[in-house]
Amino acid sequence: PPDVSRWEGREFMGYKRSDGQVGTLNNWLIIPLVFCENRNVQILREAFEKELGYAQPDLYRQSVRELVDQYTSGKSIAHMPHQAVVDQERSSSGDASSRVFPFLDGIKFLTHEGGCGGTREDAQSLCSLLAGYLHHPNVAGATVLSLGCQNAQINMLQEEIEKKNPDFD
């Protein structure tokens, strides 16, 4: 094994998971087991991101509006402020202080096109992939949506999680 003695006693801003993995982020996932839930995932995204403080800044809307106004008023392209978009992007950053849950770094909304029809092997592969996401050390927790009628069932997902980590919490 490599000599790691020079790093003994050092710390970093991270999260140690119960299985020994270490993450540098604390994200929550919203995952559907079937593509029929994708619309619900999108509705949740629209409702949650802004209200909980995780919405990305709308970097370009104002700049595009200004460019359109200038264009429609007859100004030539040479007089349009090309630097405005870049300046706006540089000044925008996510404001962690506005988050309802300050120790949660983000909410990730995943969608896919599987889970319903197809073969059982397809459903098994999907559940294995989703279990990998759930087991990632940067994931603090998840909300899993299921209709109950799809091939990719919650017990199948639980089995795949257990294969990756029998003590998953």
Describe the function of each predicted region.
Residues 1-169:
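Metallocofactor- and cofactor-centric catalytic cores in central/energy metabolism, strongly enriched
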